[in-house]
Swiss-Prot record:
<comment type="similarity">
    <text>Belongs to the UPF0210 family.</text>
</comment>
<dbReference type="InterPro" id="IPR007841">
    <property type="entry name" value="UPF0210"/>
</dbReference>
<protein>
    <recommendedName>
        <fullName>UPF0210 protein LEUM_1180</fullName>
    </recommendedName>
</protein>
<comment type="subunit">
    <text>Homodimer.</text>
</comment>
<dbReference type="Pfam" id="PF05167">
    <property type="entry name" value="DUF711"/>
</dbReference>
Length: 447
């Protein structure tokens, strides 16, 4: 590397909030299945703690040696519903607690994979897991969950969407924050290192390391140097910056995998904000030329940003995967919080933005009296965007009891704060209650 490039990397870390957002170890649990849930839970605990015992130590070594912060160390596992074919909802809690205990034993921040894949229908394990979610997510601290309810190839499972709306509502009655640990996907990916949607897909190797980079602050600082330039210069600047960010992620991931004696999976290029000022995707969009995120032009600016990040990243790593785009979680992004508070950023605009970025309606507070069918309808709209456009979309929505539109809700830490946003009050219940399955789009038939 040239001296100038080395100095740029140092500045990115010290001044522009560049970090490795997560080093996530993916672990297959297919070989832990035993005759009864309690024994399977013991096997899960043993495998996770065996492989992940040095994850924290190795990540901290790399941090010290290279001066690059690694914010989170996490684990993802095989979707638990796949290994729980005969389980009841009560049985599922053995698995949830085994995951939670294992995560605490090795010291990671979160463990993902308390998940089900129901885009085409339910198996017994899927239903048991979904029915267990209100207890599983409120009785554990570090367990993250996801449910995939649609795909471009399979279509959309409207029965699952109805059930997930009821589940989100049920969770909100037990906890204000537990829904932050649940993502409802369309077109979920198998190698996502980010929470809460991470799980270890069945086509993955036994144990892998996946890395999620971040750097909204780095991109914003780079764009500050090209004020007034053409939009082509903006795109080129983002591409070059994403290249540098991804190189750092590639190096950290390869080192971590080598030292842990496991395979290196992918680098996820996603720009993931935090509530800290200067670490905001909204501020990047505003630097491109918007007075405030949510105004007209926001979707176009986000499309440009997302595309340029991907183009720069794929040149820097042969192993790009995960979600790889820009995240727009309202409560976790200082600029999004401001725009939502002022009414510039609405649910409708966020839905439009999800058509061109990762991932969806994310970390959005809505009134606690929002009906289950309205929540289901929001999930259905997001799924439709993902399924029709062959991309990942998701919903992580937070109905908060006792709140009304305009109230501020503090979720703490990286989860941030969010204003309660209005939802349309007209009912979608008759649509959701039809149930059944929305067929796959015509362009999914490619064989």
């Amino acid at each position: 590397m040239e001296t100038k490039q080395i100095q740029e990397t140092i500045n990115m870390v010290e001044e522009e909030h560049l970090d490795i957002r997560t080093v996530t170890m993916g672990i297959s649990l297919l070989d832990t299945i035993a005759g009864d849930p309690q024994q399977t839970a013991k096997n899960i605990y043993k495998k996770v703690t065996t492989y992940a015992k040095d994850l924290i130590k190795v990540a901290e070594q790399i941090e010290r040696e290279y001066g690059i912060p690694i914010t989170n160390k996490r684990i993802s596992v095989t979707p638990i519903a796949l290994i729980a074919g005969h389980a009841t909802p009560d049985d599922m809690l053995y698995y949830a607690h085994a995951l939670d205990d294992a995560a605490k034993a090795v010291g990671v921040d979160f463990i993902g994979g308390y998940s089900a894949l129901v885009q085409k229908g339910f198996a017994n394990g899927d239903l048991a897991l979904i029915k267990s979610l209100p207890r599983a997510l409120t009785e554990t601290d570090l367990v993250m969950s996801s449910v995939n309810i649609g795909s471009t190839k399979a279509g959309i499972n409207l029965d699952a969407i109805k059930l997930m709306g009821e589940t989100v509502k049920g969770i909100s009655e037990k906890s204000d924050t537990a829904n932050a640990k649940l993502v409802i996907f369309a077109n979920a990916v198998e190698d996502n290192p980010f929470m809460a949607g991470a799980f270890h897909g069945v086509s993955e190797a036994d144990v892998v390391i996946n890395v999620g980079v971040s750097g909204p602050g780095v991109v914003k600082r780079a764009l500050e140097k090209v004020k007034g330039e053409s939009i082509q210069v903006v795109a080129e600047t983002v591409k070059k910056t994403a290249f540098k960010i991804t190189r750092v992620g590639q190096m950290v991931g390869a080192l971590a995998a080598e030292r842990l004696g496991v395979e290196f999976g992918i680098v996820d290029l996603s720009l993931a904000p935090t509530p800290a000022r200067g670490d905001s995707v909204a501020e990047v969009l505003e630097e491109i030329g918007l007075e405030q995120v949510g105004t007209h032009g926001t979707t176009a600016a986000l499309m440009l940003l997302n595309d340029a990040v991907k183009k720069g990243g794929v040149m820097a790593s042969q192993r790009v995967g995960g979600l790889s785009g820009a995240f727009i979680p309202v409560s976790e992004d200082a600029g999004m919080i401001d725009a939502a508070k002022e009414g510039t950023l609405t649910l409708s605009k966020l839905e439009a933005m999800t058509a061109v970025c990762s991932v969806g309606l994310d970390m959005i507070a809505i009134p606690g009296d929002t009906s289950a069918t309205t929540i289901s309808a929001m999930i259905a709209d997001e799924a439709a965007i993902g399924v029709q456009n062959n991309k990942t979309t998701a919903v992580r929505i937070l109905p908060t009891l006792g709140t009304k539109v305009g109230d501020m809700v503090d979720y703490g830490g990286l989860l941030g704060t969010a204003p309660v946003m209005p939802v349309v009050e007209k009912s979608s219940a008759d649509f959701i209650n039809r149930g059944g399955h929305i067929p796959a789009p015509i362009h999914s038939f490619k064989n």
